[in-house]
Amino acid sequence: MAPRKNKVAKEEVQVTLGPQHLVGETVFGVAHIFASFNDTFVHVTDLSGRETIARVTGGMKVKADRDEASPYAAMLAAQDVAEKCKTLGITALHIKLRATGGNKTKTPGPGAQSALRALARSSMKIGRIEDVTPVPSDSTRRKGGRRGRRL
């Protein structure tokens, strides 16, 4: 029988989530707020937009379908996202606000303003606020047919 080999102790690698930073340093993330009239998404990524840090919707916070787009649901979603960001070390956010856009409405839903205010009140520093609603240069045909929506 061959002699037994001694097991080599493996070094444990410490894995940390979130960006590497110094204590007290402001670390930026990007909060993508998509506010339609049916729901509100608050999605925080790193600066490149590739790595998702937290994503919460208004529908995840309330039970009734009619309340998904409400300002209250958006506020709860934004507070939840801010809490997750703080645990991962993100202290400041750039805001990208988006409405449905395209050939539909270009105005953000009711949850947009309350989500932004909730992020600001939860001691997150706000960097730049930008509207990224897709606006067509020449739109496709709207829904409703030749004679339009008849009430």
Swiss-Prot record:
One of its GO terms (molecular function) is structural constituent of ribosome. Keywords: Ribonucleoprotein, Ribosomal protein. One of its GO terms (cellular component) is ribosome. Residues 142-151 have a biased composition (Basic residues). Disulfide bonds: none annotated. Residues 131-151 are annotated as: Disordered. The keyword NADP does not apply. Belongs to the universal ribosomal protein uS11 family. NCBIfam families: PRK09607.1. This is Small ribosomal subunit protein uS11. It comes from Bombyx mori. The gene is RpS14.
